[in-house]
Amino acid sequence: MSIKSDRWIKRMAEQHAMIAPFEPGQIKHDAAGQRIVSFGTSSYGYDVRCSREFKIFTNINSTIVDPKRFDPGSFVDVESDVCIIPPNSFALARTVEYFRIPRDTLVVCLGKSTYARCGIIVNVTPLEPEWEGHVTLEFSNTTPLPARIYANEGVAQMLFFQSDEVCETSYKDRGGKYQGQTGVTLPRT
């Protein structure tokens, strides 16, 4: 299993719609020329953006977080260019990009150093072979202060690993519960 280069990522995005919308280079400035957190193709990965759709965790109901019986009322829905995550809390978002993962490929997501150095951690489980959809992103604010996330700017990097053999059973074959997700998706069992 080897990590894939920018050439492979570009080819798969352009010929097989693996990433849409797709940016073949690194974007570091907005339309007004202001610096932003970069996104787009890097040497051995793809830096994704989060959309303007956020779900900010709150404990107004004083409930217990239970992945089998998750209370959607534990989140406040926000649509904005900026998301303020409360201290020691988290927020969910989704990528701008829609992914279609090839059957012989596994994708691992890592945070961007710009956010990590501010105490903001990104958590995403691997994108499995033949999974497709918008990626639900989880941002943890590990600081005792509110933290800011910017929509339509880079938030995480996807690394693509291609196996030397095609898997016997893909995520699609298993009927994975998050297949084809298009919005911020809460836990399912």
UniProtKB/Swiss-Prot annotation:
Which positions are catalytic residues? E138 (proton donor/acceptor)
Question: Out of the domains of life, which is the source?
Answer: Bacteria
Q: What EC number is given for this enzyme?
A: 3.5.4.13
What keywords does the record list, in alphabetical order?
A: Hydrolase, Nucleotide metabolism, Nucleotide-binding
Q: What pathway does the annotation place this protein in?
A: Pyrimidine metabolism; dUMP biosynthesis; dUMP from dCTP (dUTP route): step 1/2
State where dCTP binds. K112, S113, T114, Y115, A116, R117, T136, L137, E138, Q157, Y171, Q181
Any one GO biological process: dUMP biosynthetic process
Q: Does the keyword Metal-binding apply?
A: no
EC primary class: hydrolase
| Reactions catalysed, as given in the entry | dCTP + H2O + H(+) = dUTP + NH4(+)
Q: Which CDD domains does the UniProt record give? A: trimeric_dUTPase
Molecular-function annotations in GO: dCTP deaminase activity; nucleotide binding
Disulphide-bonded residues? none
Q: What Pfam families is this protein classified in?
A: DCD (PF22769)
Q: Which PANTHER family match?
A: DCTP DEAMINASE
> Partners and quaternary state?
Homotrimer.
Which family is this protein grouped under? Answer: Belongs to the dCTP deaminase family.
Function per UniProt: Catalyzes the deamination of dCTP to dUTP.
**Which NCBIfam families did the record assign?**
dCTP_deam
Q: What is this protein called?
A: dCTP deaminase
